[in-house]
Structure formats: structure tokens, C-alpha cells
Regions:
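A generic structural signal for short, solvent-exposed coil/turn residues
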Residues: 16, 35-37, 52, 59, ...
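Post-signal-peptide N-terminal segment of Sec-exported extracytoplasmic proteins
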Residues: 46-77
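A short, structured loop/turn motif at beta-sheet edges
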Residues: 60, 83-91, 122-128
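Short, low-complexity, polar/charged sequence segments that are solvent-exposed and flexible
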Residues: 61-66, 79, 85-88, 138-142, ...
């Protein structure tokens, strides 16, 4: 019986140390230059799934936009990057009401049945918001749809 306790202790101790190590977070907050905790500092939109492993990932910051798209099955991958100006950034972020972001509801993933998952990630100075298949939320999704439409307007035609 003492051997079992010893083995359990041998497994438990390193796990506890790893847990403590990973829970210590000494990251400093990002310096965004903004004093408003509701200012948006990062947007990510992705559409991933399907039988062939299609993906489109768009990352947007105040000064740049980056797109990755491809099909995993065919091993095709394309990337596009561009700088954006403050007018474009303001146009994108104006579609989002930060006060209602917590009210948006996600839906279950559809990738397990060869469906696509649409994911939005919006980071403010204060909080990080993630939504998966939020289009089922008929009340608050409208702002994400407007954001998606604005993003599509920025992309070159070969990536739409």
C-alpha cells in the first residue's frame, strides 16, 4: 500500500509544480497607447473546416492586415499582408459595439460533421472576446456580420 502512495506522490508532485509554473503570469499589459479600456486593439476572423480542410484566417491590428488561406488536403497555402491606415481601422472598429460584446452567444462547433466554423476574436485593452458560430445569435451577431462585410471589402478580389 505504501508503494501506491509513493507512486501517486511521485506523479502528483511534478504535476503540481507544472501547474504552479504555468499559472504564474508575469506578462505585462500591452502598451497600446490607449487609456480607454474599451478600445479595440486586435481583430481575428477565421473560417475553418470542410472535407478538404479549407481555412481562411485574417488578423487585423491598427496598422496591418494579414490573411492566410488554403486547403490542407491539397497542401495549398497563400498569404497576403498589407498595411492599413487609421481611417480603415476606424471604419472596421466602428461596426463593433464593445458594450454588447459580452452578450453575443456562440454555438457548437460544426467541424466534426465536415462543416465550417466561423470564429471571431476581438481583443480590447480590457478583455479578450471569442465567438464560434455566433451567427445563430440573431440579436447581437449583426455587428459581427457588418465587421465581416467590412473585412471582405478590404481584401483583394483573389482572396474573397
Amino acid at each position: 500500500m505504501s508503494a501506491i502512495k509513493n507512486l501517486g506522490l511521485k506523479i502528483f508532485s511534478p504535476m503540481l509544480l507544472l501547474l504552479i509554473f504555468f499559472s504564474c503570469d508575469d506578462k505585462k499589459p500591452e502598451n497600446t497607447g490607449s487609456k480607454n479600456p474599451n478600445d479595440i486593439i486586435f481583430i481575428r476572423y477565421s473560417d475553418i473546416g470542410g472535407e478538404l480542410g479549407n481555412y481562411k484566417i485574417i488578423k487585423i491590428t491598427k496598422d496591418s492586415i494579414q490573411l492566410e488561406t488554403g486547403i490542407t488536403n491539397n497542401k495549398t497555402h497563400k498569404e497576403w499582408k498589407s498595411s492599413i491606415n487609421s481611417q480603415v481601422w476606424n471604419q472596421l472598429t466602428s461596426t463593433i459595439d464593445v458594450k454588447t460584446l459580452d452578450k453575443i452567444k456562440s454555438s457548437p462547433s460544426k467541424q466534426s460533421v465536415d462543416g465550417f466554423d466561423e470564429t471571431f476574436q476581438i481583443k480590447t485593452v480590457k478583455k479578450y472576446h471569442v465567438y464560434v458560430n455566433a451567427y445563430a445569435d440573431t440579436i447581437y451577431y449583426k455587428q459581427l456580420q457588418k465587421l465581416k462585410d467590412q473585412i471582405q471589402n478590404i481584401l483583394p478580389t483573389e482572396y474573397k
